[in-house]
Amino acid sequence: TLTKKIQQKYQNFKLSVSLTTRSPRSNEVEGVDYHFVSRTYFEELVAKKKFYEYAKIFENYYGTLKKNVDETILKNDIIFDIDWQGTKQLSKFKNLNLIKIYLITINKEELKKRLIKRNQNTKEEVKKRFNSFDDDIKHWNDYDYIIINKNLDVCFKQIEKIISLNKKRISISSHIIQ
């Protein structure tokens, strides 16, 4: 929701569509939410060094193709909706001029509540996300900005301020975006 809101207000911001080996959820669209690929194909791309970043998260791979990013940044600013592992890898590429924003829920219970309310994850996925919270939050200091994601409108206003201050490419990592 938040990335869509950013794109609606800022026409020059495009979402980097990641590749993943996981199955699509019922509401996801190929090429809009993710590019859904086989594990074999993903591993071939890794071997050929085609990714700016990739990570294995809960038994599935996610990654950002260099080609897609390089084509996008010629004309637009780009939003990466990725976790801390991806952000850490992308940070090595200075040409991307990242402004790193970490969105975090207030606490683990709120994360669990939002994941269940979103109704897009299995019980097992919710449990894994819940259990990884403490480890994930340890990486907050790798970011330029930390935003507590309590309210969508407040969160969006904070991101607007960051955009106006920086006018650069932005990486948004989060436990959950409403």
Describe every region a protein language model picked out.
Residues T1-N12:
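A conserved segment at the C-terminal end of the G1
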Residues I78-D83, F93-R118, I148:
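Conserved phosphate-donor/acceptor-positioning beta-strand/loop module used by diverse small-molecule
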Residues K117-N121, D135-Q178:
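NTP-dependent small-molecule kinase module
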